[in-house]
Amino acid sequence: MHKIIKLNLLTLCICAANQSYALQALNDQILSDVTGQDGISITHEASKVDIKQLNWVDPAEVGKTPIKLGLHNIEVKTATGYNNIKTKLDFDVGTTQLANGTQGVGIQLSASVSPFTATAAQIMLMCSPNCATGETDQNLGSFKLSTISPFEVYLATTNGLFNRDSKVHLDFKLQNASISYGQNNQDLTLKDFNFNLSADGYLYIDETEGVVLTSKGSVGDNIVVLGRVEDKTDVHDSRVGNATNPGLNVDLRYGSANSTHRNLIRIGASGALTNGKIALNADQTGVAKFNTVNRVNGNVQENEVVASAGYGFKNAGGLHLNVSADFTRAGNSLLGAGTPTTFELGHTGTGSYAIEFSNLSPLNVRTSTDPNSAINSQNAYIDFGQIYINNIRTNSMGFVVNDQIKTILGAQNYELIYNPSPTGNASNMAFIAVRGLDFQAIARKARFISDNSIAVNNTNEGTWGLGIPIYNLNANAAFFAKKYTNTAGTVKDGLGYDIAVSTDGYGEDSQGNPKTTSIIVIDGAMSKHGEEVNYYTGLRNIDSYFKANGVIGFNENEIYIKADSLLFAANAEIAIGQLPGSLYNCPAGVNTCAKEVVPINNFAKKDDVLASIAFMLDGKGELFIIPGLEAAGGTPQSNYLSFKSNFEFNTLSSTDLSNESKKGSFISLSNTDSNGTTTKTSSFNLNKMQGHLGLNGKIQMQKDAVVMDNQVQFNHKALAGGQGTAFRAEVALSPTGTMQKVADIAITGGAMRSTLGITPR
């Protein structure tokens, strides 16, 4: 025993002596120079990483077994042209200085990952080992993430790590990535995905909001920049070195891993944002709360209603997220040399075109009825509301709608109770809820742009614009595994869904500024008063409710969406006029006239309304989304988005057919007249709609126009070679509020074709 100890000591001494060349004496002066200013740097390299399971365990409902959502059989490999996956982390604590000159004592953290490809063979929703009767673990599909540019994150603080009163700087660079969701050897892919963000702001922990990252603090706001990113794929020779994609780029493609992906749609955003905020916590108590907005005699009434059914999981925990930001436009005091916010929307792939939207503004042009008051300088904005993510197990859930939708549906209560489960029993599902999403932005300028695969499209910025603001959107979405049968009769795996969505048509904030859900086109030509005239036309103040459940399947060359049940109800105003706060234009032939402001609450009035439209469609349907072809030399004539769909109305019983108060599926055009004391509403109606309709179409984004070709089939099955059902409806008038039947109509077959081309000036 003693000999062994002596031998070990001898061995230690020999090893120490052998390595003594690496050691040197340090005096006090040298020690005083060691400040740790270089921090800690960690570099890790791997040729491959395998992970069997990566699971998120949701506590679900109190007293019940948890549900897991995870990525299984993960494989991370190097990207083509790289030997290893290189991960580097630099961490330093001490004196810091941000790019804007702010100094302090905090941390600097820099992390990067070289290009890689990560694949998860299964996205699993698991109840095991405690599955209830009839429940099984569910495979929801596959996931893949790959990059061709390094993924980089940089964070610098000026006072510790979390401090609501001291600035931080964040760079987040996920550039030229590819993110795919797969089913049946087909992938829905975000190609050239960018989330390229640079921001100054504040990072802190709040007792209510949780972890908060915001650009706005007690001493003012800062800029968040979505910087454009160099396009490294499919760039035209004339644009090499200058081709860029938006800082937030969502480019949807579809196809198998071994084929050229086809083209769906592209959405992008770039430029400077303000009042940006991200908050993350586990508080789920708000998931059962619905804010609804009712309109009574032109007055707005906002109410909070707590749903009673299906939200027992709110006391157990989950993920709660809030994201919001304001858009900037020319003249914003924080912009400096920065670029205002722009949106891009259009087709994608070789030879494609899109529309760039700019001058993002609120609905109201002014905030005062004084004709000499300044133009509204408030920002347009997006607030994604309160987002809740959970794994749930239920077969009953409540969803609250406003008074307008309750009337259209003929519902007894504001809370609509439904079963989101694919069976009659409670099932485990992945669940996402949104409460109070607002997108209040009008794009008053627009121009056509070209894809980087072709030469630059040098069209001038037009005087037209588009507004698709959304007010108080609430949504429930549940997802689960579900089988379906394709057109060839083959049973395939699909993603089951159950979705409920609602919007409110009109509301006002605490200062009386209007909010709306609308789809309007803007004419921003100059008026006789020397400012934009702001004519608009379209559907405004849209109250809507959409409820569907079914399955999403990935077929070869097409995306298949089946709705086993589909209910869509809405009420809107068909209107033409000028935006609130604009100056009324002078009459034709008159060059000068007195300045008068369009009322700020103009959207709450009926002055611009041509008619109101309301409808309810209740039945089932199918939608086939067919992506555009991707090929060298592609053009809008070969690369376009098309679709085929059909909808079958629910059959009414003989009792309901003979009951005039039962409208079934209907469309109504109405007009309201008022003499100041009494109001009368008359309407023209198509009630009790039945049959099987088909709708096919294609959308072509051209160099300077949008062209839509459509075909409506009045007896879908008959035209498809089967035994069909004629389209039938009841024509009725309601001149005094009482429904009066005029006639029955039936269309036994045939198709109606139309082509709509929109060429802005």
Per-range role (PLM):
Residues 1-25:
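Gram-negative bacterial Sec-dependent N-terminal signal peptides
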